[in-house]
Amino acid sequence: MLTCAEPLISPSQIDLRVGHILYCKPHPNADSLFVSTIAMGDDPSSSVITPHAELDLPAEVLAKYSPLPTVRTVCSGLNGLVPLAEMQDRKVVVVANLKPVTMRGIKSAAMVLAASPKAPAGEEASHKKEFVELVSPPEGAQAGDKVFFEGYEGTPEAQLNPKKKVFEQIQPGFKTTADQTVAFDRAQAGWVGEGEKGKVAGEAVARLVTKAGGVCKAPTLKDANIS
């Protein structure tokens, strides 16, 4: 009896896009969280967008972005790490096909990528982050533009199945290089030797780029983790 083999794990399965934060505020129920309203090029029929009638945006924001594009509500654990002022009216890179989760009463429908220094030798990787930078798409990139790791082009999954832990097998390879470029590093992800089984072939270190060739970067952090 023939059985269908599981598809190879690939960074192309992750829906990475340019997002535009229209407005951000502290989460009312969690001191470590921000709640952002982010445009990322969604179709109006998408089940993950926030209906305009449910938005609570200041009048000046509504006036600035009239007509208001489709948006998602996104919670991020960046409060206390990134100044609130830096979370307003700016382009970011988002993971757009994670299963939405409710964070302290607010449904979050994407994840904002940020760089943080690697833990010093001898310390746990989960050490407290004291300095975080948002990943910046290249100048001129627009909300909804697809970004991908060079050599790993493909069609993302509509929604990643959390039971298969696809993102968890890929994200550990996200990093910045010596020139702050965001990249996927196979070795850092453990995709070498026995770890290559079930993984697609590709570049050892692949930059995160737009179709136009622009590169996504962190402002200053080199050899940093991306999450």
Please state what every model-predicted region is.
Residues M1-S227:
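Phosphate-backbone binding interfaces of nucleic-acid-interacting proteins
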